[in-house]
A protein has these predicted regions:
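Extracytoplasmic Ser/Thr/Pro-rich, glycosylation-prone low-complexity segments
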Residues: 1-191
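Short, solvent-exposed loop/edge segments of extracellular or virion-exposed proteins
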Residues: 190-198
C-alpha cells in the first residue's frame, strides 16, 4: 500500500463480530482494518471508542506508518486453510515519527471451525514481532477494537496510556480478543492435619 492508503478485500470466510456477519474488509496502511468498508486515509490515530474512527475496527497498531526509501508499505494477507485462520500482516513498516523505526505486526482471525465460541463471534489475535511505540508528537499509537456503531470498544493503549491491567507492547507479545471466558483455575489449599502452638 502507498502512504495513507487503503484497500478493500473480500474475506476468505464470513467473520462474525459483535454478533454481525461480514464478508469484506478495508485494510489501512496505518495499522488497522475495518469490517465495514470505509475511505478513511488520514494518519492521525484517536482513542477507542471514537465516532470519527472506522466502524468495526481492529487496530493492532494504529499510527502514522510511512513509505520512506521504498515504494510501498508491505501489507500481506494469507488464508491458512489448514490452520483455519486469516492473517493480515504489516511487515517492516516505518514509523512516521522518525522514519527509521520498523514495525512488524499482524491480525489473526480464526475460523469458527478451528476455534469455536459460544457466541459465534470469531476469535481475533494481535501479534507483534517487532514493535516500538515511539510517536511522541501524534498520540503515540492506538491499540484495540471498536464496535460496528463506534459506541463501544476495548482499548489497550492510546497516547502511551495503557488500560488497567494491560501488558505493555513488546516484541513477541500477543493479545487475544474473544467472547469466551477463561478457564477458571483455583489451586488446592494445603491443609495441616495437626496444629500445635509454638511455645
Amino acid at each position: 500500500l502507498d502512504d495513507d492508503d487503503h484497500v478493500d478485500i473480500e474475506l476468505p470466510f464470513q467473520v462474525q463480530y459483535h454478533g454481525e456477519l461480514y464478508s469484506e474488509m478495508t485494510i489501512s496502511s496505518n495499522g488497522w482494518v475495518s469490517l465495514v468498508p470505509c475511505n478513511i486515509d488520514y494518519f492521525w490515530n484517536m482513542s477507542i471508542p471514537s465516532f470519527m474512527g472506522p466502524k468495526a475496527m481492529l487496530a493492532p497498531f494504529w499510527d502514522d506508518l510511512e513509505v520512506v526509501g521504498q515504494d510501498w508499505i508491505r501489507v500481506y494477507t494469507w488464508h491458512d486453510t489448514v490452520g483455519g485462520r486469516f492473517i493480515i500482516e504489516w511487515s517492516r513498516a516505518l514509523n512516521g515519527y522518525d522514519e527509521l523505526t520498523e514495525e512488524t505486526f499482524e491480525i489473526i482471525i480464526y475460523e469458527n471451525s478451528s476455534m469455536p465460541t459460544d457466541s459465534g463471534d470469531n476469535v481475533i489475535d494481535f501479534q507483534y514481532l517487532e514493535i516500538a511505540d515511539v510517536d511522541v508528537t501524534k498520540n503515540y499509537s492506538t491499540v484495540g477494537i471498536q464496535s460496528p456503531n463506534n459506541n463501544d470498544g476495548n482499548s489497550i493503549i492510546f497516547n502511551n496510556v495503557y488500560a488497567a491491567g494491560a501488558a505493555p507492547l513488546s516484541n513477541g507479545r500477543a493479545i487475544r480478543f474473544t467472547t469466551m471466558s477463561p478457564q477458571s483455575y483455583v489451586s488446592p489449599l494445603e491443609i495441616e492435619t495437626e496444629n500445635t502452638p509454638d511455645m
